[in-house]
Amino acid sequence: MERYYHLCKNHQGKVVRITERGGRVHVGRITRVTRDRVFIAPVGGGPRGFGYGYWGGYWGYGAAYGISLGLIAGVALAGLFFW
């Protein structure tokens, strides 16, 4: 867990892809990191458009939510998968 804490702390503000041990995948910008959680804001558009404008509280990205560091199986920079 300590490894993921430091990894997330070093990539705070960047878009990442986080995979939970159960297989669930989260893609978003890391907004905050605590000793037991990482908070990410989802990126990209949704049913409301292309991610532009001021809805959801994070410049069009949606509200940040927390993921327990104990559930994380892997963290990677999202740019490695999308470009």
Curated annotation (Swiss-Prot):
Principal cellular location given in the protein's record: membrane
Transmembrane segments: 58-80
Membrane topology: Single-pass membrane protein
Keywords: Membrane, Transmembrane, Transmembrane helix
Annotated compartments: Membrane
Tree of life domain: Bacteria
A GO-annotated cellular component: membrane
Name of the protein described by the UniProt record: Uncharacterized protein YodI
Organism whose genome encodes this protein: Bacillus subtilis (strain 168)
Record gene name: yodI
